[in-house]
């Protein structure tokens, strides 16, 4: 099992699919990485040589922000918005949708389970 960017990627899958197990690498970035390293698209992870795995690691370390660094950066961006007190920061702080969705109905994923209000009848 190859270990890239601190993640054990599955060995039987194609390289293009296996790279997507790394947080921060989706279809587009995985295709770009495979193209840069010049690995055939049908190659599986267990068929990679140590040199190819090393090249993949180098490309990811040099060109992409992945895993812990990406999570930390995202968290810091949200914290910065909350500290500024801007509208988006307030929405994050209150646990409400940030991007303008309606909240009168729906938004249950963001708001959590419905809370019963005592004495409220229709």
From Swiss-Prot:
<dbReference type="InterPro" id="IPR018269">
    <property type="entry name" value="Ribosomal_uS13_CS"/>
</dbReference>
<comment type="subunit">
    <text>Part of the 30S ribosomal subunit. Forms a loose heterodimer with protein S19. Forms two bridges to the 50S subunit in the 70S ribosome.</text>
</comment>
<comment type="similarity">
    <text>Belongs to the universal ribosomal protein uS13 family.</text>
</comment>
<keyword id="KW-0687">Ribonucleoprotein</keyword>
<dbReference type="InterPro" id="IPR001892">
    <property type="entry name" value="Ribosomal_uS13"/>
</dbReference>
<dbReference type="InterPro" id="IPR027437">
    <property type="entry name" value="Rbsml_uS13_C"/>
</dbReference>
<dbReference type="GO" id="GO:0003735">
    <property type="term" value="F:structural constituent of ribosome"/>
</dbReference>
<keyword id="KW-0694">RNA-binding</keyword>
<dbReference type="InterPro" id="IPR010979">
    <property type="entry name" value="Ribosomal_uS13-like_H2TH"/>
</dbReference>
<keyword id="KW-0689">Ribosomal protein</keyword>
<protein>
    <recommendedName>
        <fullName>Small ribosomal subunit protein uS13</fullName>
    </recommendedName>
</protein>
<dbReference type="InterPro" id="IPR019980">
    <property type="entry name" value="Ribosomal_uS13_bac-type"/>
</dbReference>
<feature type="region of interest" description="Disordered">
    <location>
        <begin position="99"/>
        <end position="122"/>
    </location>
</feature>
<dbReference type="GO" id="GO:0006412">
    <property type="term" value="P:translation"/>
</dbReference>
<keyword id="KW-0820">tRNA-binding</keyword>
<dbReference type="GO" id="GO:0015935">
    <property type="term" value="C:small ribosomal subunit"/>
</dbReference>
<dbReference type="GO" id="GO:0005829">
    <property type="term" value="C:cytosol"/>
</dbReference>
<dbReference type="GO" id="GO:0019843">
    <property type="term" value="F:rRNA binding"/>
</dbReference>
<dbReference type="Pfam" id="PF00416">
    <property type="entry name" value="Ribosomal_S13"/>
</dbReference>
<dbReference type="GO" id="GO:0000049">
    <property type="term" value="F:tRNA binding"/>
</dbReference>
<keyword id="KW-0699">rRNA-binding</keyword>
<comment type="function">
    <text>Located at the top of the head of the 30S subunit, it contacts several helices of the 16S rRNA. In the 70S ribosome it contacts the 23S rRNA (bridge B1a) and protein L5 of the 50S subunit (bridge B1b), connecting the 2 subunits; these bridges are implicated in subunit movement. Contacts the tRNAs in the A and P-sites.</text>
</comment>
